C-alpha cells in the first residue's frame, strides 16, 4: 500500500519531507508556536560546556550523513523539517499518526551502522509502527558493524530490521556486505545504495584533483581523524598507531566523540575556542602524549558544531588521510581528495562501494606520505573513482525516483583525464612562444 502511495507522489512537488536525524546541532523547541526554529547552544570554552551541544547529534560524523538527504532532494522548504519520531510520538500521543500524515508526504531516515548488538531500536520502532500504512518511509545508509549473528541483536533492533524490510518503501543499505548479511538472515528487500553523504555535493566529487597534493609530497598539509581517545587511562592502540604514523607530517586532527574520554580536562576553561572550532594543540599534544608514550604531532585539533565549518576547515589542507569515514566525506564534499585508513567492515564496505582509495594505517606508515599520495591520488585512480561514482549516483537516483524523490543536481559527466604532464615537444613550443614576447 505504501509503495503505491509513494509512487503517486512523483507528480506532487515540492514534497513535504520529514528527516529523522539530527543534521544540525540545534535545540528542539518545546513550544507549540508556528514559524520558530531551535536555538544554538551558548558559546563555551570547555569540554564539559560542549557536552550538551554534542548530545544534540552524538558522534559528529552523524551530521555529515544526516544532513545529506535534506541537501540532495528537492522539497518544500517551509514544509520540511528535521525531527525525532520517537520524541514526537511521546509528546503528542494518540494523534501522532494523523498529524504526521497530514503534515508530511514522506519520512526519510538516515541510519548509519545500526546493525550491531549494542543498538536498541525499540523507541524508533514504536513510532514507525504507529505510522504504518499512514505515510511512506524511506531508510538510507543502513550498515553492518562487525559480523554478528541476528540472535546477538537486541530484540528491538532485530524487530526494527524486520520492519524496515517489510514496510520501508526504500530499504537502502551501505554495501554488499550488509546486503548479504540481511539476505542470509531472511531480509531480502534491501537496495545497495551506499551512504547518502556522497551524493550531497556531486560537483565537488567530480572536481577532485590529486595533483597539488602529489606535487607537495612530504610537505602536504593533511587533515586526519581516528580514535585518539582514552580507555583505561591510556590512548587506545588504534589511536597510538595513527599518531605515530603522522610523526613527521604536518597534520590537523578532527575529533568526533573523543573529548568525552578526557575526564581530567573536562572543566578546564579556555581549552576550546568555538570561534575557530579548535582545541589548544599545545596542551593536548603534551597531555595526550603522556598517555601515548610520546608527544603527539598534530598542529590543530578540531571539533565542529556544524558541517559547513568542517568542510571549510578541510580547504586549509591538501588531502584527508584518516581512520573515520565521514571525516573523509567532509573533505570530499569540499573538493579535497581523501584517502581512507581502513580497519573494519564499516569503512571497507563504503570505500569499496564507491571505489575510494584506502589502505591500513600500518601500510600508510610503511609507504610514507609522498609514495601514498603518488599511488592513491594518481590521475588513473581518480578517474576510475569518478567513473564508478557516476554509476553509483545513477543507481541511487533510479531507486529514489521510484518513490517520487528528485535530486536537484544529477547526471554529471565524468571529466576527461588530463595528461600527467605536457608532452616534451609541446613544452618546447611554449618556451619558444614565450621568448617571442619577452
Where would I find each of the regions flagged by the language model?
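Active-site anion-handling motifs in enzyme catalytic cores
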Residues: 2-438
